[in-house]
Amino acid sequence: MDTVVDARGLACPLPAVEARRALAGVPPGAALVVLATDPEAPIDVAAVAADAGWSFAAERNAAGWRLTLRRPELGRPAPV
């Protein structure tokens, strides 16, 4: 099950701060989804994913951004 952080309405760097706080609670192979409206959020949250060694994908929609950080499975590196 994915963990969702609703950071809509928060200005950067707060979406990235909230994402970093949530990392520890995500099990291997699962995803952390950050919902954000700040246009800089994809850049900051991508840096959080890179620092953690997790994969990252950003999707723009009518409500803002859906940013997905996926924790690697145990014993597997994150996809590049």
Please provide the spans of the model-predicted regions:
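Amphipathic, hydrophobic secondary-structure cores in small proteins
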Residues: A7-E59
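Right-handed parallel beta-helix/beta-solenoid
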Residues: M1-D6
